[in-house]
């Protein structure tokens, strides 16, 4: 798998980050992976650029499930993220759910690509589930508010649990769920960010095995 052609499209309502995903070991067409962020903070907008971390985190499980030998990303993701993904794959394998070997992550040298210059700050995924809420509580207990690791932003994602089927976007359900989380986020001092992705529309394992 190759992840390349990072881009940004701005509109009055949202900022869309995109990348082209090319399959190497599966007979699947190139696909565009997007993350659409609404109500982005001004300090983030000023330094906006595609982040290799986000695309690697999204594409690594896809590459692993579909039997890609590698995932080559035209960027320089965080080494800690790479180590964490390898660790996660080891867990998946120990649980008996991985039919293929772990894909190797290949990155571009730092000299060949820019390093994000924006402010560093903690961010989390929040769906309202117990695990996410526990993680947020533990983070706020462990770090001081002045620490960059202190979580101040939380992503609520359309296209993951809600709206993961293209034929049924569930926009009203997503809106209600988002609004129900806003008081909780405000109480925790976290800014809740609406994000949409099309990752769930990528090839499903059943189709990939049939094509393979």
Residue ranges and their predicted role:
Residues 1-122, 138-196:
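RNA-binding accessory domains that recognize and position tRNA/RNA substrates
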């Amino acid at each position: 798998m190759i992840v390349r052609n990072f881009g940004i499209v701005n509109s009055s309502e949202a900022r869309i980050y995109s990348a082209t995903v090319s399959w190497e070991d599966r007979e699947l067409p190139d696909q565009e992976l997007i993350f659409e962020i609404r109500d982005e903070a001004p300090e983030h907008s000023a330094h906006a650029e595609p982040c290799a971390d986000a695309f690697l985190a999204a594409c690594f499980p896809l590459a692993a499930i579909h039997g890609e030998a590698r995932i080559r990303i035209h960027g320089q993701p965080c080494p800690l993220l790479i180590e964490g993904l390898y660790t996660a794959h080891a867990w998946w394998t120990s649980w008996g759910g991985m039919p293929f070997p772990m894909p190797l992550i290949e990155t571009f040298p730092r000299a060949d690509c820019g390093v994000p210059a924006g402010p560093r700050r903690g961010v989390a995924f929040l769906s309202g589930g117990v695990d996410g809420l526990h993680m947020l509580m533990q983070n706020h207990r462990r770090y001081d508010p002045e620490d960059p690791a202190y979580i101040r932003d939380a992503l609520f994602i359309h296209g993951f649990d809600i709206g993961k089927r293209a034929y049924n976007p569930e926009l009203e359900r997503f809106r209600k769920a988002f609004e129900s989380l806003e008081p909780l986020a405000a109480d925790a001092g976290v800014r809740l960010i609406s994000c949409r992705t099309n990752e769930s529309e990528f090839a499903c394992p059943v189709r990939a095995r049939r094509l393979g």
